[in-house]
């Protein structure tokens, strides 16, 4: 038999690969893991070398093998920390005893391990320029290094309690130079804690806190007594009255009256304050407003801004006309006449005219005891005296009387001839009478047949009936959808009428 064609055997027929060296996947391997660890250590040591262990050859067989170029850095070479896999502190003798106890005699694996250990010893003993092989630290050394690092981090922590170097700021913090030693803070008199001076420490903190809280608060307004308020109101009213008189004088001189326009902001601000409105009413502010609103001496109205501002102020002004004093004050001031004039003036704007009409309605009803209820208005109509037209006087016909006096002789002549005046007038003249309107003055008012309560009840009933009709329609629709007529249909053999089922 020839083994030339078998790729897994050599020329002598021996197998190229010994399958006994490989373990079964299903069975646990009995070989130790030290071989893998040693190979890994060798590989790491080889990486620390200068060149690569795998030379690159050119296609030319004559050329020498060239090594890969490795760029050397100026900094120190960094060693790689590989996690601990085996404990190298175990002596070679113990390892040999362990291996001998397992298998007995020497094996190929033992030879390999021995050769590798010799190489390691040679590398460590050689004094060449190559760096020594990195030795993996054991567990004890690693723990000690971690503890040292921990203590170093604690020592360099800025939050530690160690006392640092004293600076000038520390000296100036509590400056007790020039004081009696017994009064110094923490001096020779004994240890003193900050609680020994509670007033000084707490006082400063409280001041800072109070200042922070006071920043957002408004200052409390000082309350004035009634005498001061009355004096302030009198001064303001005097100033405003002088302003109105100055504008009237400027208008007589033909100059522009702008003083009231300048003081308008003061007027609106002062009269807009609720706490001062009652005081202004007591001092007769309605007369002042009448002087500001009335036409100027040349008949022109004041500025439109003045009129609009005063009308808005009067709308919100608390004039209680239920009180007798307030009603009399409003009547004597003459302000109502000016407001009535503005409500009917064609020169006034629509908005101001509307405000004036609202004021007239609001003030006139309490003064004239008018009611806004419809029933009261009906009673007023019934109590009112009906209007009667004066009797029409027939004009006396003086011309006919004169003609009759002049025709006296003619009448005598007619009598002689046997004709009366009536016959002659009828035959000779055609008279027409002007129709006169009969006076339609009714004395008895017809009774109203409209009952408002009945109308309201009828409207409610109609609305309820409409709702009921809508609900009945909806119920009928719901009932109609449920009840579907099921009728048997005749199926045609020819397929007629089947389109409806598709």
Swiss-Prot record:
One GO CC term, this protein: nucleus
Region (Disordered): 1-61, 87-208, 385-434
One Pfam family this sequence matches: Med26
Residues covered by the TFIIS N-terminal domain: 287-370
Name under which the protein is recorded: Protein IWS1 homolog 1
Ranges annotated as biased composition (Acidic residues): 13-22, 34-49, 87-97
Superkingdom classification of source: Eukaryota
PANTHER family tied to this protein: PROTEIN IWS1 HOMOLOG 1 (PTHR47350:SF4)
Function summary: Transcription factor involved in RNA polymerase II (RNAPII) transcription regulation. Involved in transcription elongation. May function at post-recruitment and elongation steps of transcription. May be recruited by BZR2/BES1 to target genes and promote their expression during transcription elongation process. Required for brassinosteroid (BR)-induced gene expression. Required the for regulation of numerous nitrogen-responsive genes in roots. Acts in roots to repress NRT2.1 transcription in response to high nitrogen supply.
Record's compositionally biased regions (Basic and acidic residues): 1-12, 138-151, 181-194, 401-417
Cellular localisation: Nucleus
Keywords, alphabetical: Brassinosteroid signaling pathway, Nucleus, Phosphoprotein, Transcription, Transcription regulation
GO biological process: brassinosteroid mediated signaling pathway; regulation of DNA-templated transcription elongation
Disruption phenotype: Semi-dwarf phenotype. Stunted growth characterized by reduced leaf petiole lengths and small leaves. Altered responses to brassinosteroid (BR).
Sequence positions bearing Phosphotyrosine: 185
Assembly and binders: Interacts with BZR2/BES1 and SPT6 (via N-terminus). Interacts with ASHH2/SDG8.
């Amino acid at each position: 038999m020839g083994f030339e064609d078998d790729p897994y055997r050599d020329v002598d027929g021996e197998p190229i690969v010994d399958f006994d060296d490989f373990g079964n996947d299903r069975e646990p391997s009995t070989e130790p893991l030290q071989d893998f660890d040693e190979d890994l250590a060798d590989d790491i040591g080889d990486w620390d070398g200068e060149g690569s262990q795998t030379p690159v050859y050119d296609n030319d067989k004559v050329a020498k093998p060239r090594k890969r170029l490795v760029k050397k850095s100026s900094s120190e070479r960094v060693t790689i920390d590989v996690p601990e896999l085996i404990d190298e502190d175990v002596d070679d003798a113990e390892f040999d005893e362990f291996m001998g106890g397992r298998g007995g005699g020497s094996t190929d694996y033992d030879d390999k391990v021995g050769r590798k250990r010799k190489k390691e010893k040679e590398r460590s003993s050689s004094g060449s320029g190559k760096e020594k092989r990195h030795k993996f630290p054991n567990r004890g050394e690693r723990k000690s290094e971690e503890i040292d690092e921990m203590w170093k981090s604690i020592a360099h922590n800025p939050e530690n309690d160690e006392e640092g170097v004293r600076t000038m700021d520390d000296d100036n913090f509590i400056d007790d130079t020039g004081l009696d030693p017994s009064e110094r803070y923490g001096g020779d008199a004994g240890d003193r804690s900050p609680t020994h001076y509670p007033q000084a420490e707490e006082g400063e903190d409280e001041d800072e806190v109070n200042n922070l809280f006071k920043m957002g608060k408004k200052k409390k307004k000082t309350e004035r007594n009634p005498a001061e308020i009355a004096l302030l109101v009198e001064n303001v009213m005097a100033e405003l009255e002088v302003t109105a008189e100055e504008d009237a004088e400027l208008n007589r001189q033909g100059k522009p009256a702008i003083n009231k326009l300048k003081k308008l902001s003061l007027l609106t601000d002062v009269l807009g304050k609720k706490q001062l409105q009652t005081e202004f009413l007591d001092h007769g502010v309605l007369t002042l407003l009448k002087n500001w609103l009335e036409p100027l001496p040349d008949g022109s109205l004041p500025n439109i801004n003045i009129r609009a501002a005063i009308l808005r102020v009067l709308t919100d002004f608390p004039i209680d006309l239920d009180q007798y004093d307030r009603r009399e004050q409003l009547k004597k001031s003459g302000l109502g006449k000016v407001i009535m004039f503005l409500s009917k003036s064609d020169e006034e704007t629509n908005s101001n005219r509307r405000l004036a009409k609202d004021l007239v309605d609001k003030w006139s009803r309490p003064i004239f005891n008018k009611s806004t209820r419809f029933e009261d208005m009906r009673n007023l109509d019934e109590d009112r005296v009906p209007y009667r037209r004066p009797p029409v006087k027939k004009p006396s016909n003086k011309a006919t009387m004169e003609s009759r006096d002049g025709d006296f002789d003619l009448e005598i002549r007619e009598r002689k001839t046997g004709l009366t005046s009536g016959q002659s007038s009828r035959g000779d003249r055609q008279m027409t009478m002007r129709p006169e309107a009969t006076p339609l003055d009714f004395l008895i008012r017809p009774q109203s047949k409209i009952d408002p309560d009945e109308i309201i009840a009828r409207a409610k009933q109609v609305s309820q009936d409409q709702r009921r009709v809508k609900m009945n329609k909806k119920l009928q629709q719901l009932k109609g959808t449920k009840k579907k007529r099921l009728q048997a249909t005749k199926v045609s053999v020819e397929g007629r009428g089947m389109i409806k089922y598709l």
